[in-house]
Amino acid sequence: MTNIQDLFSVDRLRPLGMQRREVQCDIAQDLETILQAPLPPAKTVTTRDGQKTRQQAACGLVQAAPGTGKTVAALVAAIRHCHRTGERVAISTYTRALQRQILNDGDIERAKALTGQEVAVAVRVGRANFISRSRVEAYDALFRQEGVDNAFWREFVSWVRSWTPRTLPLDTTFMAWRDQFESLPEVDGHNLTEDMLSIGQESTKGGAPEDDPDEKQADLEGLVPEDDAIADARQQEKLAPADEDKKDLFYYRHHAEYAKECDIVITNHATIALHAQSRGAILGNIEAVIFDETDRLPDAIRSLYSHRMRPHLLLNTCERRRGRRVPKRQRQIASAIDVCLQEIGEIFDRRDVTPARLKESAPAHWQRLADLLDAFRVRGCSSDLRGLRLVKEAFKESGRKSGSGIVYLSFSPIRKYPALCVDPDPVDVRNLLARLITSFTPVDAQQSPAANVAPADPDVAAEVADEEIEDLPFAGFRHAAYISASLVNPIDRDPMAHVHHEYGIDTASLVKASQHEPPVFGSMRFVLSDPSVKKPFLDRDKDADGEGQQGLPYNPAWLDYIRRAIDHDPKRRKLVLTPSFLDVRELLARRGVSLSDGETSRSVILDGVLYHLPGDPSHQVATHVRRDDVRAIITPSLWEGANLVVDRDDGRRIVWMQDLIITRLPVPPSPPDIVQNRMVRAILANPKKTIRTREYALGLLLRQRATQSLRKLLQGIGRGVRGPDDAIRIWLLDPRLELPAAWAERVQEALYDQDASDTLTLPLDRQSFPAHKHWINVIPRRFQSQIEQSAFFAQSGRLWTWADITHKGVAA
């Protein structure tokens, strides 16, 4: 078989429009090494059911800089593994953006051409991605009954009706529609949503209760029909439930079955976890898995294993068990709860939030949700009511611990569906990740090829197995490769030393842990912040650890500082990354455009600046790079998984923006006290921890938040260099950053010598949050020397370039 270096030769790459990148070759080589590695020695462990053989997959970690061709390298390694062994491979991602890139941007065809080998590849998506023909017909009947005539909607309906049994399943998804149009149709000014039109989903919005105390919530009424109205429309169409199910699931079932037959399956992290839990029933016999966007794998697992409750789904379950419909009023209340949860998600950037924090930060929404929950009733389904009772109690007690559970609002990792969660115990993500790559078989069981377990090493002493790990059947993975642009822990001295433990990988199972960064790839310059701007939030005490996202007033001086940066040199295109939609709303308000609390708004273009608001999905916002009238995009959604590239006149592709502005570091909010105390107890109860003090546990949690922040910052900076010809200027405008001492001293002296009105004043004895202290560690090594020659953006709005400083300053 041809070696990797020969595959990535210039002669092979040039016809594909690709350039040779040594780092891409190295990534593919590392992945192949991991996939070829022998299984680690098995261990004999003692469980409650007797002695068993515990076997982990051969695993490896690969970190590579953004834009270096990780995805094509992974596909090449997967194709070669399929041909070499006959085994099937899964490639798992977190974002749908990367799945679309693999599917639509030619990565699969390029990988096939490089290897010279043909394989069957399927992209496996969930049923919520498929359009329900019966729901489309039901809405169409309802709109016709109400006299609604909309050309865009008619075009959408005609497209759905044009499907035939020979239509490819993926051509019946929302992704296929968005290949032609940016959004779903609007009817009477309201945008239809995917969860309203997808198979197996109920509408998430509906009429508010007739006695809703807040009469201003007019958006709860009108467009979206109640389930009863949909049922009436279905009856008019004479569509029986069995026929409806068969009609809706036809393409999805073909899609799912085809994926089981293919050599390589592209899917997402949650599906991989469900595949393991189902004993391989979802994807079939998969022997190897490559996790792309690995840094988001823990988030997907954490969300998947939380106990989630959605009111309208609870009513559906009750209807099935009782055999009759629930009262229409309860349907209305459930729909109103869903709308309220969606609005809360927009306020909190779809992060988990407890009732106590909600009451503090958004009291009107807390009161509204508490009233709706109090009115929500589910009769005749007692087995499903314990979680609902805990939720109601938590709101009555303002978020204190209720029974044995912690109640909070959460949002699904991919589709961002809201749910009320009851979590009785901390989700042990590391343990759950270990389950994906661990198998247990009885010692005296007859070994079979399907077991995928190597013979136990007789020299290994018996150990006590983790009973929780043992509970989950092995999915069949013999090899697991983890790849990402942000695997490392930027705070540790050896950034890769302990990363494998975060993913439940034993040291003995670790084949390779490598980092790759090209010596030359693009160019990057920097602009650093003015610490005299103070902090983004006015409450200094609560913001001391970098939190501040929720419930704290914004600092108008900081907002104006960011506005000046956006307006500086308007001829240069800018991508402005900020952690929260609240930031976007506040920046828009400084322009004189205010939005009412809870208002779901579409993005606004003002003076050439696009303000991304929750009403538009991120992939739709990204398409605005093709518009000549957009000079800047402000968004919290494009930190990762996005390639904002445009074609040059010479045919090469470069990033759209010339400036990338980081408004503030994306620091996760500190958890509520009740959740933090629970996490501390879990850390102290871990028998593997040698240090068991509360201070140690709190410090560990603080470092974990800082690591999450820096990993996301690394991804955000990576948006700026996607190819060898890209040249980007990075603005780091968080005034809490700890500035390099030598650079700051040089700038201070230069400004003083020029008798400038601008000054650089460093705070004295400031206690820095770890992410604000160690941010330089995420700058690519090849660009770190540029930090000492950074420009300085003063509070006045003047940009002092390094040439300005050195020409007139002390170096002159």
Please annotate each region the language model reported:
Residues 675, 686-693, 732, 736-812:
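N-terminal targeting/trafficking signals and adjacent low-complexity tails
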Residues 201, 205-206, 227-260, 273, ...:
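A contiguous, basic/glycine-rich beta-loop/short-helix subdomain that forms a polymer-engagement track
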Residues 532-544, 614-738:
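Conserved RecA-like P-loop NTPase helicase motor core
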Residues 578-612:
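Conserved helicase motor "Helicase C" RecA-like lobe of SF1/SF2 P-loop NTPases
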Residues 74, 80, 97-100, 104, ...:
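Signature of the SF2 helicase/ATPase Hel1-core->accessory helical subdomain module
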Residues 2-14, 19-22, 40-56, 66, ...:
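A substrate-engagement module of RecA-like helicase motors
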Residues 88-96, 481-485, 572-584:
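Conserved RecA-like ASCE P-loop NTPase motor core of nucleic-acid helicases/translocases
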Residues 532-579:
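Conserved interdomain hinge at the start of the Helicase C-terminal
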